[in-house]
């Protein structure tokens, strides 16, 4: 049965995985508030991770993987035999953010075109980071 996670997030994809050799769930998501005027209803930064040891009924934030005046989205994750996670995601400038805060005005056409300067990112996260 579906239920709310109680985690704040804009319009952005998440990535849910089970920690290898464990019943714990790991969620990667954008830990930011809903902003109705923003083009994705909130800032897609930071890219964060949370763990659930009760089947997703409650979540504890572990930490941030990346952050900045950018959009961090299209998350994918696979675990290696060592238990380390390989997290891939897209990083692109968000002209509506200044110093981590929504500036309150819509981006210009030129600023939106700059969003096509995208980087594919990869992070290698050791297994023990999830259970620190």
Show where each model-derived region lies.
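Asp-box/BNR beta-propeller blade signature and adjacent active/binding-site loops
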Residues: 1-132
